[in-house]
Amino acid sequence: MTERTLVLIKPDGVQRLLVGEIISRIERKGLAIAALELRNVTEELASQHYAEHEGKPFFGSLLEFITSAPVVAAIVEGPRAIAAFRQLAGGTDPVEKATPGTIRGDFGLETQFNLVHGSDSAESAQREIALWFPSA
């Protein structure tokens, strides 16, 4: 069954010129890019995207980071796309939890600056795709 997931290449990934490497890894995994856009993130979009973290101590710095520079937003499709991309991304903490061979394990240094976001469930993917690609 084909799934769709939202993938974000965060400001650190864009600024470090890792977009091509990350997209290549997604495609080599057998996933397809259905939509792709480089965009600036408004505080409103960031707040909606990260609504589950509102009230947590890191919420303000998370919004500041994601709105600090452009991100690449993509709809990625394929069999088990959600789990496949999350495996490809690696653990949230790039140093302690992400294994070598994953995007975060190979390129990440800090939890907040962990290069990519991928939806964590079918429900999240549907909500996030609607936020980032309203006409999709």
Swiss-Prot record:
It holds the Pfam family NDK. GO terms for molecular function: ATP binding; metal ion binding; nucleoside diphosphate kinase activity. One of its GO terms (cellular component) is cytoplasm. Keywords: ATP-binding, Cytoplasm, Kinase, Magnesium, Metal-binding, Nucleotide metabolism, Nucleotide-binding, Phosphoprotein, Transferase. It is found in: Cytoplasm. It is an enzyme of class 2 (transferase). Disulfide bonds: none annotated. GO terms for biological process: CTP biosynthetic process; GTP biosynthetic process; UTP biosynthetic process. Its EC number is 2.7.4.6. The active site is at 117 (pros-phosphohistidine intermediate). Its cofactor is Mg(2+). The keyword Cytoplasm applies. It catalyses: a 2'-deoxyribonucleoside 5'-diphosphate + ATP = a 2'-deoxyribonucleoside 5'-triphosphate + ADP; a ribonucleoside 5'-diphosphate + ATP = a ribonucleoside 5'-triphosphate + ADP. It comes from the Bacteria. ATP binds at residues 10, 58, 86, 92, 104, 114. The keyword Acyltransferase does not apply. Homotetramer. Belongs to the NDK family. Major role in the synthesis of nucleoside triphosphates other than ATP. The ATP gamma phosphate is transferred to the NDP beta phosphate via a ping-pong mechanism, using a phosphorylated active-site intermediate. This is Nucleoside diphosphate kinase. It comes from Mycobacterium ulcerans (strain Agy99).
